[in-house]
């Protein structure tokens, strides 16, 4: 798609396509009209929810099942605030999510305009990062950064607040692969000396036990966990989100830990 004469909403939709998005979940409203208009000419499928909270949970569930970034699209004010439970669920469970919230026009920000709220500010503690876009030319970079942040490191939700004049305005900036994230550091692998130290401590352990969590699931380490447990002959217990990493019918399985877990798993730990 050519960059010529595209408005902000069309740029957002094109960026979604470039990130491999083929389905989004949402509920329309006045400030989001440019976004929904842009979807009419797109191959991206729109799944209409009956409530914005439902749209966010649907995007969350889609991300859990497919491993892709889930995308939700809602309108301003109550549409945005209705997403907060779904956003925080994704944050706590490390689910990659991009939530697009419409907003009043930029000249009306901070003036108690109709359905205006500080969406990016209110979600600051419940997302990996939040954006308030005030210039259509920022959209290509912001979209690229948002998906990168959502899916890398410990996955999680990113919110992009889109004023109506930004999605309706013309964007002249090119689509880009460049990002400006000087403070965003993705943890690397552990140094060899740290791995060797951990291995030495494990070898000295008299009663080793493995506690398996969600990280093993999202890193696709199920086979390695099983091989490690069998080599150590160590019992394995799991967090709620780690269920499924280790076979529950295995002789070394103690089941889930915690208040809803098994007695013997809790006593073993």
Residue ranges and their predicted role:
Residues 2-269:
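N-terminal alpha/beta PP-like core and its mobile active-site loop of ThDP/TPP-dependent enzymes
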